[in-house]
Amino acid sequence: NRALSLESIFSSPINFETFRSYGMQVNNFYPWLTLYPLFLLIKFTNLAIGYNLFLYIVTLITLFICHYVMYEITKKHVTSSFFAIIYTTSSFRSVEIFLRGAMGELLAMSILPLILLGFIKLYDSKKESWVMLAISMTLLIYTHVLSVAMTMVMIIIALIIQFYRKKKIEIFLIIKLIKAAIVTLLLSLAFIGPMIEQTLYQDLNRPYVDILQKRAIYLGKEFLIGSIDSELLSFGIGLTLLICLIILTFNFKKLGILSKITYIMGIISILLCTKIFP
């Protein structure tokens, strides 16, 4: 229905074609730009063919993006291929495809590796190295707003780790981040502007408010079983990543700077999903 609701998106964000024509206003608050190709595929084929074709195309794009990003970082095709396969076939993507049908989160996962590369490129000596971060963050804003918030948290954590490691504020990095933020904001105004305007104007009444803290996992037996179990509804990082985590833990001192920072951020990400974090 999210895709079908884009039938009249260029004339009005409110759609009367779905959900018994009650007038769905979700497009004011939920990005739709990267979802529009799904609507076109459904329009020119049918719902089943268009939906499955879209999933196939997104999966291929995710594979190519992951390989490109990791190759830019490591310059190793084997490492890049392993990363692309593990990331694209991860349990979370499988849940989004086969259980939840959450297209926004699925598309966001295709963009996140580009943001990683964009952040790493900030340390490049080239003056315009911030452009990739600005473009990829803009794409994410037009795809999934919650992912933007989580990405910003991870960027802040990475900056804190870097500050702790170097004991100084890197002015050149701050300048590039400011440039990327300004350009991202300007490019995203087409969505952010109407969303803020409607948020301030409309009283949003939610029939049910979920308490996410209740869904947090216990860092112990539940986490280990969820990681080893192949059940998509279980909570964990998966057997492959669990093995990688154990290996990296015992070989932490041998890792390079980038690998150490990535490892630390991975541990922090896991802790944020547990009962430890309020």
Each language-model region and where it sits:
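Membrane-embedded transmembrane-helix bundle of lipid-linked glycan/lipid transferases
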Residues: 1-278
